[in-house]
Amino acid sequence: MSPLPEKFTLRPVSPEQVTTVLAPFLARLNREPERHIGYCDDTPEMMVDTLGRMSPVPVDTFRLAFEGERLVGALGFDTDARLGRAWLFGPQVEHEAWHAVADALFTAVCPLLPEHVRELELYYDVRNTRCHEAAVRWGFTSAGDSYVLRFERDGMTGVPHETAESLTPAHHDALKVLHHELWPVSWLTGEQLLEKQDENHRLLVLTEGPELLGYVFAKVQPEFGEGFIEHVAVAERARGRGLGRKLVAAALRWMFSWDEVKVTHLVARAENEPAVRLYRGLGYQVLHPMRAARRPIG
């Protein structure tokens, strides 16, 4: 790894700096495709919200790089004890010595990882070539490509008028089984999907008598004008009937029923070509071509 020149210092982030320094820095750089990190947001307000929901808290997981008193880099992580994984928020660096700063941040952050973390993940726009170079240097290997797709409100004129039912307790068990079949290592379990249901998180389903054919899990963040489809699943025996399209169309109508919501996003694996065609056929546009990379700990 590249040595860090003496003029740089690495520091923890204070509680006050999370909102006044860290969030604006991450969001500003994240708006550039060549710097984009999938786990970071593009506005300070959304970044503050994301940082506020992290576990452990950012003061325990982030390090900042300074040249004198100028902030030039940041890196931290969020974790999931069940998956044993840490997602890296960065590296975000604004300096010509990009790789030296990134290497120093990575070296400083790794000792902060909790014991339950067995694997690290980077998630970056494929145009972020410096992050890719760092991933290779740090021993990460590719975990697959995906697309972040965007759909704006004015595209609803071309969306069919499809409806889906709200999930009822009669199909709770079937949903958990289907979710595990299709997403065995998802960051959300079927039980967690059920627990997340509230005014802003909706599970919509298609059924045939007592049988669950498919579901979509969508959420809205009206305070930020955004919606997001987290999961779309159709039982294998029910495929080829256009049910995925119906579910996504119904989710779009639910999300845009909120006047505050102006745009929605979803993520699709690049290798899942039928799903990508479905989303693009409804009007979604590719915003970020993304790459995940992982490295085991130890």
Model-derived regions, located:
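Short amphipathic alpha-helix that is part of the acyltransferase structural core
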Residues: 2-47, 157-186
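Active-site rim helix/loop that mediates acceptor-substrate recognition in acyltransferases
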Residues: 30, 36-62, 183-212, 217
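Conserved donor-binding loop and adjoining core beta-sheet/short helix segment
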Residues: 37-104, 216-230
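Conserved beta-strand-loop-alpha-helix junction that forms the acyl-donor binding cleft
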Residues: 93, 121-131, 265-276, 293-298
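Conserved active-site alpha-helix within GNAT-family acetyltransferase domains
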Residues: 126-144, 245, 270-288
